[in-house]
Amino acid sequence: MPDDPSPSRRRFLGDAFALGASSLILPRAFGAVREPSGATVLESDDAHIAIAALDPPSRVFVDHEGTGLKEARRASAARFTSAQGVVELAPEGAGIGVKVTCPNGPLTRVVLRWTTTYSPMSLFLGDAWERGYGDLQWRFLQPERVMPWYFAAHDPSSGRTVMYGVMTQPAAMCFWTVDATGTSLWLDFRNGGGPSRPGNREIAAATIVSMTTRPLTPLAALSRFCRLLSLNPRVASAPICGNNNWYYAYGKNFDADAMRRDATFLAEISAGHANRPYCVIDAGWTPGSSAPGGPWTKGDVAKFPDMPALAADMKRIGVRPGIWIRPTALTVVDDPKRLRRGPAHDEEKPLDLTLPENLELIRSDIARMRAWGYELIKHDFSTYDAFGRWGFDMGAELTEGKWSWADQSLTNAEVILRLYATLREGAGDGVLLGCNTIGHLAAGSFEIQRAGDDTSGRAWERTRRMGINTLAYRLPQHGAFFQIDPDCAAHTASTPWELDRQFLDLIAKSGTALFVSVDPRTVTPEQKSAYREAMMTALSGGARGGAEPLDWLHTTAPREWRIGGRRVTYQWEEAWGALPFRV
């Protein structure tokens, strides 16, 4: 961001960066040198990367009651005060830490504002609150656009990419907006749909970092920035791959024998590879709807009478057992006091995630599945259960107003962080796959994250819209936050094999997590050969050199890819083109 003429601000920044530069974890190929500006420049054979500390914001605004923003008074270069609180900026690692105290009242939002300008040719990309919904894209300047957690501004004419973000696991829900005169970071401290009441404690709200690169491609730039944002990811020891029965069963008409059949198919298409894949039992192994809640003490008595025995059978077949759970809601409610207030739209009732007894229930449910022998636990629906909205509808509001958790001292981000820590504790050394989870809060707790909304075994258009988009636009997070799961490469009689086959090929070669979803009874010899080739590639980490979308600046479903140094064109469209209807 532009230099500020104030000597005190410049001194503050220089000191901040001097303290933070040594803590960076960077590729060995780079060497660091100090420029007179105070930025650190990382030189390699092909890139110039500057990790520059931001200037303090020119203005700070606070909303305590949820009634509107009011400008805070600048007490010093790094301290801003309101009637009931204090916002302080301090050096923290490679960036600037934002700390907030509000001992005597409520706290809703804080907005940090910088005066900035960007090249008129710039295209902007932000992240999403949870999964992508086919809506991730580089876009022209749109002042009201909510860009959660981080954003990039890329100038195609110069090849320069400027990126700003907050480090993973912040204590506030954070998003950015950019307009013609400035850049704003919005920090949401609410509890449920109303203000939090943090009391006499300091909230370490976020750490802000920035990076500028040239002439790296936008993907390479964002990939390096994501590694800077997440210094302590939970890294699996090998690529995570397997199969999942959801897109041919959809939670109905399957049993333990069907899962043994799935396990046998997976063992066959991965035979000979040392990295053993996971066979995941998706929703439907307990009574209830297609997305049931707890209790999670046993399987459906008729269809899944012995869950530990099924896990043992899968291991004997030669695969690793995995299982699905919705840990944050109940189908059978033993005590209404367990439930949170606020929006609840399903028969499954959401738990209040601030109650200790509910966190203990969640921990024990996850631990029980590990004790049964399941090595990968796919947990689902927690963001929807927490806020009553899907990611595409969260926007700046996140949830409906006028409700709160039982413990109002916590921010929503802190509530979710505690949930993820509880899931991690229950899973022990097992693999956690988060679905409908908040990636920026999950990094460091989960090995793998579902990055987009569901693909489909019913309509190819859904796979085209969701799967390809999320693979391309969440690829920078792969290996930086966790392993990326772009969702299943599915195939049924309702979807065209030639298009499904291409998606299968792209996932396998990209190095992201490949999960296939197909009924083994329907697979032809040609298809089985394709599944085996893809699975063996994916288990080995994808194509050498990885995959990069080449046309993603101009489309939401990239067709042109560089894979292993070779340019590949995929054909995603059906005969009539893309379907413009809701899927």
Model regions and ranges:
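Active-site-proximal substrate-binding groove within the catalytic cores of carbohydrate-active enzymes
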Residues: G199-R201, N244, Q408-V583
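Short alpha-helical segments and helix-capping/turn motifs at coil-helix boundaries
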Residues: I96, R227-L228, T264-L266, D306-L310, ...
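N-terminal export signals
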Residues: D4, R11-A32
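Hydrophobic, Leu/Ile/Phe/Ala-enriched alpha-helical segments that form helix-helix packing faces
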Residues: C102-N104, A153-S157, A263-S270, M314, ...
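C-terminal segment of N-terminal export signals and the immediately downstream linker at the start
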Residues: L26-H48
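Carbohydrate-recognition beta-sandwich/jelly-roll modules
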Residues: T40-P277, L376
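Aromatic- and carboxylate-enriched substrate-binding clefts and catalytic-loop regions
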Residues: N275-H491, Q527
